[in-house]
Amino acid sequence: MKKYIFLFPLIFITAVLQLKAQERQDNLWKAVFMDYSLSNSSTLRLETHVRTRQFLAENDQYLVRPSISFKVGKFAAVAAGYTFLSTNTPIDRTLENNLWQQFNFSIPVKRSSYFGWIRLEQRWQSKNNVQNYGARIRFRTGFQFPITAEGASFSPKLVVFNEVFLKIKTGFPYEFNQNWTFFGFQNKLGNQLRLLTGFQRITVDKGAGYLHKNVWSSILFYRL
């Protein structure tokens, strides 16, 4: 009898975890971010993203994201921008026009830094001539650590962050949308170039189940 008392909670927990179907993708994300300084306190940025599923086998998303940012203190800035997304979905592509506003910070801690952002998005999506509007808020927080001695000619940094996306209704976050967890490295490739590359684990709530993405993500930053 005691054996069944211990087995019942285990069976119950297993059943709960399997209520939602699980799907997995192994993807590759590539992006280029170009920055142009208008002044000491303002910067224009253009992001272009190409995302593929099953590494390079299938197109997933294209993104174009222009924005402008303004420093509001020694360690903080505000930004606003627009994103166009084209996503490969069954039957037809889903197109999205997205306006967003962001507060971001980066605080030095000795040779390391603590960084993050809060981004608010207004999203207009179109698929099969059906229009939908939604909004969400994104919270990212992370750390950047040096992994070599100070003054070394080769000085990559370890970058770790987590970002949670929440859908918004009547002005308040109310529903989990997705979560990103990233572990990778960033290194300067010259005075104007730096590369951020690493592994990103993404969990997306699809309603009837969860989609898990294992992503190798690489971003090349270029300052004009």
Q: Positions of the model-derived regions?
A:
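Residues that define the transmembrane beta-barrel architecture of outer-membrane proteins
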Residues: 26-28, 60-62, 95-99, 131-139, ...
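Bacterial Sec-dependent N-terminal signal peptides
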Residues: 1-26, 224
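Residue-level signature of outer-membrane beta-barrel architecture
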Residues: 36, 70, 105-107, 145-147, ...
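Repeated loop/turn-to-beta-strand initiation elements of outer-membrane beta-barrel proteins
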Residues: 41-46, 75-80, 110-114, 149-153, ...
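Outer-membrane beta-barrel "beta-signal"
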Residues: 103, 212-224
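Detector for outer-membrane/organellar transmembrane beta-barrel domains
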Residues: 117-125, 129-166, 222
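Start-of-domain marker
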Residues: 22-79, 86-88
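Transmembrane beta-strands of outer-membrane beta-barrel pores
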Residues: 48-54, 82-88, 107-109, 120-124, ...
